[in-house]
Structure formats: structure tokens, C-alpha cells
From Swiss-Prot:
Major enzyme class: ligase
InterPro entries found in the cross-reference section: aa-tRNA-synth_II/BPL/LPL (IPR045864), Ala-tRNA-lgiase_IIc (IPR002318), Ala-tRNA-ligase_IIc_anticod-bd (IPR018162), Ala-tRNA-synth_IIc_core (IPR018165), Ala-tRNA-synth_IIc_N (IPR018164), Ala-tRNA_ligase (IPR050058), Ala_tRNA_ligase_euk/bac (IPR023033), DHHA1_dom (IPR003156)
Entry-linked Pfam families: DHHA1 (PF02272), tRNA-synt_2c (PF01411), tRNA_SAD (PF07973)
CDD domains documented for this protein: AlaRS_core
Localisation: Cytoplasm
Source organism per UniProt: Lactiplantibacillus plantarum (strain ATCC BAA-793 / NCIMB 8826 / WCFS1)
Family membership noted in the UniProt record: Belongs to the class-II aminoacyl-tRNA synthetase family.
Alphabetical keyword list: Aminoacyl-tRNA synthetase, ATP-binding, Cytoplasm, Ligase, Nucleotide-binding, Protein biosynthesis, RNA-binding, tRNA-binding
Name of the protein in question: Alanine--tRNA ligase
Length: 880
């Protein structure tokens, strides 16, 4: 067996398929782009869906990648098994309508067994196939695989519901009898069974059917190959590691954790080993996720990161790590993965800052969680039960980040069990909620074969020409059918040449009209999208008959187009200004460029202050007024990166890219349209800045005429305010408003002082009226005060002087009622609690309330019920 590092193995796989004509596709971000069906990129094929469903035709139908992925559905198994991980890399080779089973199987065998490549012993390899897939079995035999090493398994069929599906073939490596954890006669002791001896290293999916909405399986117009090889598993084979964790992908993290721990060492005992593994695994996932722009929060993928951080911290405590430690593992992860993911190491300082902040935050939450757990244990014991409720264990897990096994361990120390079945019910409900939140969108579309088959060329000339463009009508589609002519109604059209921009990168499509050779308008263009073979597909409203192969004049709506391109150029200036003010960690997370406004989403940890927003706005306007030239060139990706161009949504770029520069200030990969000079924008104004999710902020802004109109409207509003506050000049308005606020505050203080004196005067009369109820003294009165604050002041006075054992006060303010109950410490010890009393009388005023044993309050909407409530207080005390 060769001795290879994880970096060498990864590169060897990519090099092999590059030799077979595959394009090496860079790993996409873990945060999905334009895919609401996924929380995370969870496989290599997840980034290839647009090719497999036919919505985009790739430049090269053969592709290969090493794709970072995250899965958290089995998070509780991480650290307890040899191969469960949250972050993993999936090596894959893909064919979109090119080669199929024969080549995929032949190349897999060559990579695995050739001395030039992996060089594994053929006798240690086993293959499973779908029983009805006789072709796969035949091709495996043709490569030299022994018939008894080919096993038919009914589950070998890949199907995710509607969309591409097909049989698959799994490849297993026999690690030998030393790894066997089952008896010889165990039904799972075979390649494909649940055992440790036969390790699945590769899965080849033969995507050859469309699973239709009706439940039938129809042959795909273009058959595909989708494979997945877990890098971590393959590395464990090469490095003869008992588990994935004893490889160079994890051991440096484990060794660093050993250094930081309280004298703990990996391998000393199984319980500590689980914690070492969990920390190493989660450190990788946390580091990569934050590097890709996800941030800790209480929702979505941010919640996943927060859970992983908290889980790692809790396992750190088991190893004696009482201080923050997780941030110190970030650079270790960066160094391990630097050869293929240099950005992770580059972003280490930023990631460390986020992790350290989250660790500090959790230390506070942890204490709250432990207090809750101790209270739950005490309550369970007091009620005579021996099992902690599953819903309580789930609350600890969901709110405080306590893993189930940790709750079970703490409960076990107190001789209590935990209702695991009840916990699983709550977990399933949570998973169902998450799944339903993403189920409205299709995970992978059905191939639209009509568009895939249309390969007539279509040249986009909109960067240079916008009107009077002569284009031949090559294709007309009506109701998913190619036709030769159309008289009226909606149709889709492809022209030999077009000035109309197709919606892409957040920029909306152009609008406009189509003229015939007589100059008469025959159609309106309402939308333009990219067809799979990169033509511009025009959605048109046909007004007069149009026919295939005729030549038409295409005119873009210039007013619409010019407003859009101003806003697009503004997004580039805004993107760079945000990096300048907030830091290089900010990344574009989405954009929308409309004619009347622009929307820009970006990643950032924390809120953006008013001062920071003002700086951003000023920078953008300074660059507009500097009259910077805007230019674009076409080049290859490598040259573009060397120029310093910012890549947004990297996976969307081909070999040849367009690089847009605004002076020497901004440079980005971009296919959109722009102004010729920044001065054309005139003015830039931020309308709003908000948070829209976990670590994602959104800015909406306007330019040019819309910016002027916004400022004019704000000026008019300011003039109205100036008139209302009688400011002599517009510039005096803030000072005048400040003076009015100061006067108002002084009046409010005077009123509060008067109310306080009045309350004290009332107190004398109120506290004189004391009733005795079965040995408990009670003051229950309706008084006239301005609100709950005054009631609490009276309660403070009552407590100081201890006028009675129990105090009940009520007041009516308009149509609302405020109630307050106070109980002395002695009576609380005797079992009389303010919270119990308030709950008994609050319904009389149509409300509810609660509080501490010594003080409680309530509100209601039935003033007429206040005397009844005060009487009910007497009755309640009499029953105690």
C-alpha cells in the first residue's frame, strides 16, 4: 500500500480524471446559492444540479471535483463511530450526457488498482449492483472483477423523488479480519452490510431515468454519471488508520486539544476519545462554515453552527478545558487544509474572533442550562418519579445546546433515567419542521429536453449595441412545442443576434420591442432568460404574426436599461465600500438590480452602526463624483484572479470571464451591464439597512433621479417639522427639537414628583384600612394613580413599614386595570405566594399575570371587575 497524505490523495483523484478529459471544478461554498431546498451543500452532486436537470449545459460535459460538504442529520453519532462526520469532502466525477456505465466502471477500476494511481489490491475490492442492472455487473466482470466479488443488493437504486434517478454501484474495500466486529454467520457480515470490515469507499450512480410527478420512470434524454468518494474514508485506508480520526486530517487537531486539556490523552479511554473526536470534527465544520460566510445565530444554518460550537465546548469541559479553547483550533484546521482551501487559512483571524465571541456567550448560557437541569432533576425527585421527561431533555438540547448524552449523564449521577423516546419525538418534530420549510421548492428539476436540443447559436451584443439590432428569428416555442410561426399571444424566441440582457447575477432582464422590416412593432419583450445552451431565450407578447427565419429589428427600452445599469455599477461600488469600512470578511450574499432601486445582501457578524453606514455612503458618492472610468475585459479565470478581481458565486463562471473595473477602486468578475463612467450615477443614497438572517445584512439603496427624489422628500418632511416646532431656519430644527424634548422631560419629572407626593398622601389612608382574615392581615384597596410604577412605589413603602401581611392594590386607567399583590417573607414561608393570589383574582378583571412569591402583578380589560377581584382576594385568603 502506498503511503500518501490526504492532500496527495485528493490531488491524485483530480489528476486522474483530468487526464480522462474532465474539467476540475473548484469546490463551491458550503452555503448554497439560489437553492432554497438545501441548508448546506451536502454532496458533490448538489452543486451540479443545474447541469443534471438540463437548465444549464456545461462547457465540458465531463467534470470532477473535491467538494466540501456538511451533513448534521446524524450529529449524535459523531465521535461514537469510526466514520460519522459533520464536515467531509466528497471526491466525484460527473458526466452530463457524455460517457456512461462502461467508462465509469472501467475508470473506477483503473484508478483504484493501477500502480500509477491508488494501486490497491484487486482482491480486496467488492462491488454491489442493483439486481436488474445486468449491464453494470457485466462491465465489472469485463474489467477483471471476480464474479463472487459482485453482490446484488436491492437497495442499490438512487432516487430522491421527482427528477433524475437510476441504479447505482457501491465499491467496498476489505480491511481484513482484524477489523471484523461481527460473527462469521451474522447476516450483516458481507460487503454492503452494517459492519466495520468492509468499508464503502465509492458510489457510482447511473442516472438514466426521470422520476415523473405521476410516479413513473421514463428514460432521460441525456444520461448522467454522478459519483461520490468520501476522502476521509479513502485516507483511512491509505494510512491504515483504525478510524477516520487517526489520519492526518484530524490528528493535528486532536494533538492540539491534548495540549490544551487537563492532562488528557487520546487513546487512554473510550469516553475521552469520544470528546476528542467530537471536538476535532466540529472544529473543522465550524471553521469552514464561518469561512464561507455562515455565522452563529438562532435560526437556519446559523443555528447549526451555534449547536456545533456549544457541543464542542461541552465535550471540552469533559476533558478539563474550562477556558475558551475552540478558537485556538481554527488555525490548525486552516493549515491542514491549506493546499486545497487557502482561503480558510487566510480568514483564520476573522474566524477565531467569531468563535471566541460565541464561546464567551455560551459560558453564560451554560450556567443557565445547568441551573435549569439541576432544577428539573430536583423537581423530578420531589414528585417521586425516576425519569426526566423527554420534552425537558429536548429543551436543554434545543435552547442550551446540551447533547442528550450529557443530560443522560448528569441525570444518571442522580440515579435518574431520561425518557429517550419522548426526546426522539421532539427531535423528529423539529426535523419535520425543518424539512417542511424547504419542501416547497423542487430539489432537482426534470430535464426540459426541448431546450437542451436547441443548439442554434445566439450572439449577445448588448454590451455595445442596444437598438436597431438585426436578428434572425431562429426558434419559436409555443406551449413547449417548436413552431414555424405565431400570430399572437405569448411565445419564447431565440434570435441569431440580440441586444437584450438575460437575467443573471441579480440584474433583471431587459425589456423592449421587436419591429418588422416595415418598422412596425410586432412584439413586446417582457423577459429574457438564459437557455441551457447559452442562448438568450426571449419571452414575448406577440402583437402581429411572426415567422421563423425572418429578420427583425430588436430595440431595448433605453430608459429602463440605463437605470438598471446605473444601479448595477452602484452595487460594485457598495460592495467595495463595505469591505473598506467593515472589513475584508464581508462577502456578497445576493443582490437584486432593478431600475428603481438596488438591493445588496452581505455577510457580517453584528449590526452595522449609523456611523459605518454614513462612511459607506460617503465613499460610494466620493467615487461617483471622482468620475472614474468603467471598463470591462474578457480573460481567463486565472488571469482575473491575478488582477485581484473579486469572484462572487464562483461556481457560475466559465473558463473565460468578464472582469469589470471601476477606476482602480473596484474590480470584479461580472457579466452584467454598466455605465461608462461612475459620474453617470449622479448620487447614491442608502434607504435602509436590516438583518435578514443568520449573519446576513441587507442594504437597499437608490441612485440618480430616485436618490434626488428621496432627498427632496426628506427635505420637505424636515420643512414641515421645522414649521411645527417654529424653527426660524431649517438648520435650527434639531436644536429646537432638542429644546422641546428637554422641556417635555422637565414637565414629566415635575409630574412624576407630584404623583409621588400624591401617592404618599394616599398611602396613609390606604394603609390604615387593614382587615384580618383568619389571622392574616390584609390591605385590599382600589386607588387612583397613573399606572403600575406608582403601585410598585406604594408596595415599596408598604414593605418598609410592613403595614400588613398581604397587600392587594388595583387602579383603573381608561379601559384597563392594573393589579399588584405583595406578600411578606413570613407569609411566603407559610405557603401564601403573591403569584398564586394574582392568578386567582386576575380573571375577575379579564386578565392574567404572575410574578415572584413576594411580588406579582397583572393587567386586565374589565374595570367593572376590580371590586370583585378585591373581594376575591379576601375569599382566597380565607381558604388558605
Amino acid at each position: 500500500m502506498k503511503k500518501l497524505s490526504s492532500s496527495e490523495i485528493r490531488q491524485m483523484y483530480l489528476d486522474f480524471f483530468h487526464e480522462k478529459g474532465h474539467t476540475i471544478v473548484p469546490s463551491a461554498s458550503l452555503v448554497p446559492v439560489d437553492d432554497p431546498t438545501l441548508l448546506w451543500i451536502n454532496s458533490g452532486v448538489a452543486t451540479m444540479k443545474k447541469y443534471f436537470d438540463g437548465s444549464v449545459v456545461p462547457d465540458n460535459p465531463r467534470m470532477t471535483s473535491s467538494q466540501k460538504s456538511i451533513r448534521t442529520n446524524d450529529i449524535e453519532n459523531v465521535g461514537r463511530t469510526a466514520r460519522h462526520h459533520t464536515l467531509f469532502e466528497m471526491l466525484g466525477n460527473f458526466s452530463v450526457g457524455d460517457y456512461f456505465k462502461k467508462e465509469a466502471i472501467s475508470w473506477a477500476w483503473e484508478l483504484l488498482t493501477s500502480p500509477k494511481w491508488f494501486g490497491w489490491d484487486p482482491d480486496k475490492l467488492y462491488m454491489t449492483v442493483y439486481p436488474k442492472d445486468t449491464d453494470a455487473a457485466k462491465f465489472w466482470e469485463a474489467t477483471g472483477v471476480k464474479p463472487d466479488h459482485i453482490i446484488k443488493v436491492e437497495d442499490n437504486f438512487w432516487d430522491i423523488g421527482q427528477g433524475p434517478s437510476g441504479p447505482d454501484s457501491e465499491i467496498f474495500y476489505d480491511r481484513g479480519e482484524a477489523f471484523n466486529n461481527l460473527a462469521d454467520d451474522d447476516p450483516e457480515n458481507y460487503p454492503g452490510g452494517e459492519n466495520e470490515r468492509y468499508l464503502e469507499v465509492w458510489n457510482i450512480v447511473f442516472s438514466q431515468f426521470n422520476h415523473t410527478p405521476e410516479g413513473t420512470y421514463e428514460p432521460l434524454p441525456r444520461k448522467n454519471i454522478d459519483t461520490g468518494m468520501g476522502l476521509e474514508r479513502v485516507v483511512s485506508v491509505f494510512q491504515n488508520a483504525k478510524t477516520n480520526f487517526e489520519t492526518d486530517l484530524f490528528l493535528p487537531i486532536i494533538h492540539k486539544t491534548e495540549e490544551l486539556s487537563d492532562g488528557k490523552h487520546y487513546g487512554d479511554n473510550a469516553q475521552d476519545d469520544v470528546s476528542f473526536k467530537v471536538i476535532a470534527d466540529h472544529a473543522r465544520a465550524i471553521t469552514f462554515a464561518i469561512s464561507d460566510g455562515a455565522l452563529p445565530s438562532n435560526e437556519g444554518r446559523g443555528y447549526v453552527i451555534r449547536r456545533l460550537i456549544r457541543r464542542a465546548i461541552l465535550h471540552g469541559q469533559k476533558l478539563g478545558l474550562k477556558e475558551a479553547f475552540l478558537d485556538q483550533l481554527v488555525p490548525i484546521v486552516g493549515k491542514i487544509m491549506a493546499s486545497h482551501y487557502p482561503d480558510v487559512l487566510k480568514n483564520s483571524a476573522y474566524i477565531e474572533k467569531i468563535v471566541a465571541s460565541e464561546e464567551s456567550r455560551f459560558n453564560e448560557t451554560l450556567n443557565d442550562g445547568l441551573n435549569l437541569l439541576n432544577n428539573l432533576i430536583a423537581e423530578t425527585k420531589q414528585t417521586g418519579h425516576d425519569t426526566l421527561a423527554g420534552k425537558d431533555a429536548f429543551k436543554l438540547y434545543d435552547t442550551y445546546g446540551f447533547p442528550f448524552e450529557l443530560t443522560k449523564e448528569y441525570a444518571g449521577d442522580e440515579d435518574l433515567d431520561v425518557d429517550e423516546a419522548g426526546f426522539e419525538v421532539e427531535m423528529k418534530a423539529q426535523r419535520d419542521r425543518a424539512r417542511n420549510a424547504r419542501s416547497s421548492a423542487k430539489s432537482m428539476g426534470v430535464q426540459r429536453s426541448l431546450l437542451i436540443d436547441i443548439k442554434t447559436p445566439s450572439e449577445y451584443v448588448g454590451y455595445d449595441e442596444l437598438t436597431n439590432v438585426q436578428g434572425t428569428l431562429n426558434d419559436i416555442i409555443v406551449d413547449e412545442t417548436l413552431v414555424d410561426h405565431v400570430d399572437s399571444g405569448q411565445a419564447e424566441m431565440i434570435f441569431s443576434k440580440t441586444p437584450f440582457y438575460a437575467e443573471m447575477g441579480g440584474q433583471v432582464a431587459d425589456r423592449g420591442v421587436i419591429l418588422d422590416d416595415a418598422g412596425e412593432m410586432v412584439a413586446k419583450v417582457t423577459d429574457v432568460q438564459n437557455a441551457p445552451n447559452k442562448q438568450h431565450l426571449h419571452t414575448v407578447e406577440v402583437l402581429k404574426p411572426m415567422r421563423k427565419d425572418a429578420t427583425y429589428t430588436l430595440n431595448v427600452d433605453l430608459a429602463f436599461h440605463n437605470k438598471v445599469e446605473k444601479n448595477h455599477t452602484a452595487t460594485h461600488l457598495l460592495d467595495q465600500a463595505l469591505r473598506d469600512v467593515l472589513g475584508e470578511h464581508t462577502k456578497q450574499a445576493g443582490s437584486l438590480v432593478e431600475p428603481d432601486y438596488l438591493r445588496f445582501d452581505f455577510t457580517h457578524f453584528g449590526q452595522v452602526t449609523d456611523e459605518e453606514l454614513a462612511k459607506v455612503e460617503q465613499i460610494v458618492n466620493d467615487k461617483i463624483w471622482a468620475a472614474l472610468p468603467v471598463s470591462a475585459i474578457q480573460t481567463d479565470q486565472e488571469t482575473g484572479h491575478k488582477m485581484g478581481a473579486i469572484a462572487v458565486f464562483t461556481e457560475k463562471y466559465g473558463k473565460i470571464v468578464r472582469v469589470v473595473s471601476i477606476g482602480d477602486y473596484s474590480i470584479e468578475f461580472d457579466g452584467g451591464t454598466h455605465v461608462k463612467n461612475s459620474s453617470e450615477l449622479g448620487l447614491f443614497k442608502i434607504v435602509s439597512e436590516t438583518g435578514i438572517g443568520a449573519g446576513t445584512r441587507r442594504i437597499e439603496a437608490v441612485t440618480s433621479k430616485e436618490a434626488f427624489e428621496l432627498l427632496a422628500g426628506e427635505e420637505q418632511t424636515l420643512k414641515q417639522v421645522a414649521a411645527q416646532v417654529k424653527a426660524p431656519k431649517l438648520a435650527d430644527t434639531p436644536a429646537k427639537v432638542s429644546q422641546l424634548q428637554a422641556d417635555l422631560k422637565a414637565e414629566q419629572q415635575n409630574r412624576a414628583s407630584l404623583e409621588s407626593r400624591l401617592a404618599k398622601q394616599q398611602a396613609g389612608a390606604v394603609f390604615d384600612q387593614v382587615d384580618d382574615v383568619n389571622g392574616t392581615t390584609l390591605i385590599a384597596q382600589q386607588i387612583e394613580v397613573s399606572g403600575m410604577d406608582q403601585l410598585r412605589q406604594l408596595a415599596d413603602t408598604w414593605k418598609t413599614k410592613q403595614y400588613s401581611d398581604v397587600l392587594v392594590l388595583g387602579t383603573v386607567i381608561g379601559e384597563k386595570v392594573n393589579l399588584l399583590v405583595a406578600v411578606s417573607d413570613d407569609k411566603v414561608k407559610a405557603g401564601i405566594k403573591a403569584g398564586d393570589l394574582i392568578k386567582a383574582i386576575a380573571p375577575k378583571v379579564g386578565g392574567g399575570g404572575g410574578g415572584r412569591p413576594t411580588l406579582a402583578q397583572a393587567g386586565g380589560k374589565k374595570p367593572a371587575g376590580l371590586p370583585v377581584a378585591l373581594k376575591a382576594a379576601h375569599e382566597w385568603l380565607a381558604e388558605q
